[in-house]
Structures are given as C-alpha cells and as structure tokens.
C-alpha cells in the first residue's frame, strides 16, 4: 500500500521517468544491452497511465531528458574543446539541446493521455505506436532534424533485426513501442493476456533474420584499404599542418598501390580547397592509374555560382584507374544534409560574432543535391554518404541503386574524443548495411573505421585513435530488399491505419 501510494505522486513519477529514460542509453553502442530499450519504453508508457495530459507531458519530457541527457552528452566534448566559451555556457548548451529533443517525447505522452486517457489495449497497442512514429518523424525533420537514439538501432544484433531489410529501422521502433506498451499493461493490470500477445509479437519477426535478401558476387571480390590518419582535430585545419597531413596519407597509401583495388581516405582528409591541390591530385591520380588502383577521398570544394559567389562543399572525389582526374569531373559527391553549427550556422550574421563556437573552421558549407548518382570507379558502384548523413535511412535508401556494389561512408568523429558518440554513429551505419543488404565501407579520421557485412555484421575493424590502415577483401552483393524497393511507405500506411482505428474506436467508446 505504501508503494502504491508513493507511485501515485507526480514528483516520484517524474524522477522515475528520468531514470527510465537514462536506462535507454544502455540499449545503444558501446553498451549494446538491447533489453534496456524495452525496459525504458515500458517505463515511459506505465508512468503516463492514469495521468492528466499535462502531467503525462511532464513525464514524457523528463523521460526524454533522461534519455538525451545521458545519451547525447557527448556533444559537450566538442563544445567544451572547440567552442571557446565558459564551462557553464557549455553545460547550458548541452542541457538546452537535451531539453529541446525532450519536447517531442513530452508531446507524445501529452497527446496520448489527452486522446486516449484510459489504460486499455487501444492506447498501448494501437494509438501509442502510431503516435510515436509521428513524433519521432517530427524530431527527425523539424529544424533539419536530429533522429539520434531511435530504439530500433538497438536491435542491430537483437531478435528483431530481421525486420530491418523488410520495413527499415523505424518499423522496429514501431514494434518496440507496441510490445513495451503491452508489457506495461500486463504489469499494471496484472493480466497475462497482454503479456502473451507481447511475447508473440516480439517472437514473430525472429525467423526473418535467417532470410538472405542478397546474392554474394565472389567473382567481384576486391581488396579494400582504408587509411585512418588519426589527425588531431585541434591541428586538422591548421594551414601549417597541411603538408604534414598530405604526407601521412600519401605515405600510408603508396605501399598499397597495385595491391588494393580501392583505397579510401576519410572525410576532408585533404584539408584544403580542391582547386588549390591540382598538382598533388593529378600526380597522385597518375601514380594510381599506373599501378591499377583507385582512391576515394574527402576534400573541400568551392565553386562559383550564378550569383558570382562561391559555394563551398564537403566533397568526395575519385582518383585512379579509369579516366584521368579532372576538376570538372562529375564523378563526385557533395554532402547534402549539413549539421547545424558544425557545417552551417543558422542566423549567421547574428550568431557568428557571439562566440568561437558559432565560428568554427569550415562551418559555411553549401548543400549538394538530395539525390546524386553513385560514385563509379573502374566498374565499382558506390552509394556515398558523408558523416551524419549515414543516420538518415530514407535519404541513403533514396540514393541507393540496384547496381550499387557497396555503401560508402566517410567521417571525422575526432570532434567527440573518447565519448560514446562515435560508437552510436557506428551502430547506425551498421543498420544501413542491414536495411539495403550491401557491404558498407566506413572510413574515418580516428575511428571507428570498419567493413560492415550485408547483414549488419562487423567483418573487419581497427582500433580508434590509431594511425593505421584497414586492409581486407570485400565481396559485393546484389539483390533488392523489400525496404530498398518501398522505403518507409508500408510503415506510414500502417501508421495511418493504426491512427485512424485508434481515433475511431476512441470516439465510439466515448459515445457509449
């Protein structure tokens, strides 16, 4: 009785919401405790039972603050190290980001309790998953979006991973919310029926993991080398270090020419404008072609636009076997989805003078097109994504082609030091390989550099914070997963059906 009385207090529920939210961080890499996702979502649903809408919204906000406060506090590393602002301001900015993201979980909980106030199957199994899909979409879209810490990623090695090639990671989010709600209902109502349904729903997708949606092409196996330069972020954009950086990458690459078919350098490995490096690029291109190798590298490009101003791009270019390198070559990729404050500054004229954090090196990039052709290197087709873009499943899928041999992502996570951020980023990259059934080549400045197999498994990787080269044989695959064919459309149809049914059944219940 004492516990029951205690749990009814709103303050206790707010505290528990913080704890359940923080627990959710354990579901993601590097911890990879996937049951924590279910426990965290169970807590969110159970704590909002029998609460007024504003009370539920507060619980949802606190739950989100626990999740994002613990799960994305790694942004503090870059702000504190490179932001040039006092410590309290750095902490405030991290808290502000966590609070902003928590608005969406607060919105979910508040609307759920407003429209479906009764603790029923309708609320937990039909309304909650549909509403969660909508609020998670908003979190990934409003103000360019930040779809980090979606619980579907926790299943990259879990029982539900077989759902990803069929309907994508967001479908796993949907099912996790449904299962968690049913478990919460079973616990609160002390009823075994929701428990049985939850177990059945959770078990049904398990056999899907054994379906192979791809066909390996062993005759097209190539040796790939990815150079991890481990250039400190504090030195990366120092002009005096440019020559040394080029030497590091060239010296690591020279022994690989003629041995590895494909050599990959990470995001902005060449820390200079492409136009300034024409002699170096043409000489390197000639050497690569003479020895029969191809190279992909990140670089910065600036092009004169129609307004007679320069647009600066975060770019991938190709060198080596095939047609000679040309600055006018269309075989390049320009990053489309830019990171706020890292690659562009909103309200630039106001914010840039305020603090160094708003005036970081290379924070005035322009966007490339949303859809871009694959990179083509001597018959190898690469669907590319730079850094943050790899977490955008729908965008990667929209750029994917049936003849894609590999997914490619290059990144620089040196901004975030030894935090958990790079591991979360890596986990999300693995999901793209699973969704599209293609090997993924991930080349980074200081880790995590790895080759991911077409089922999301880690085939090869090298340690973080080392100057090293990952060399391994990689076999491309062919075939289209259902998700590659349809994207998120089936899930949105399901969301619409669930939402319509939930509203209709709620209206009928109120009439009676």
Swiss-Prot record:
Q: Which InterPro entries match?
A: Apolipo_AcylTrfase, C-N_Hydrolase, C-N_Hydrolase_sf, LNT_N
**GO CC annotation, single:** plasma membrane
Top enzyme class, one word, equals transferase
Q: Which SUPFAM superfamilies has this protein been placed in?
A: Carbon-nitrogen hydrolase
The Gene Ontology terms for molecular function here are: N-acyltransferase activity
**Which top-level group of life is the source organism from?**
Bacteria
**Recorded topology in the membrane:** Multi-pass membrane protein
- Intervals, Periplasmic compartment: 29-33, 78-90, 145-167, 215-486
Say what happens when this gene is deleted.
Answer: Essential. Depletion results in increased outer membrane permeability.
Q: Where are the transmembrane segments?
A: 12-28, 34-50, 57-77, 91-111, 124-144, 168-188, 194-214, 487-507
Give its E.C. classification number: 2.3.1.269
Quote the pathway field. Protein modification; lipoprotein biosynthesis (N-acyl transfer)
Q: A Pfam family for this UniProt protein?
A: CN_hydrolase
The active site lies at 267 (proton acceptor), 335, 387 (nucleophile)
Domain CN hydrolase: residue ranges: 227-476
Localisation per UniProt entry: Cell inner membrane
Q: Which family does it belong to?
A: Belongs to the CN hydrolase family. Apolipoprotein N-acyltransferase subfamily.
User: Whom does it interact with, and what assembly results?
Assistant: Monomer.
- Which protein, by its recorded name, is this? Apolipoprotein N-acyltransferase
**Organismal lineage:** Bacteria, Pseudomonadati, Pseudomonadota, Gammaproteobacteria, Enterobacterales
Q: What gene does the UniProt entry assign to this protein?
A: lnt
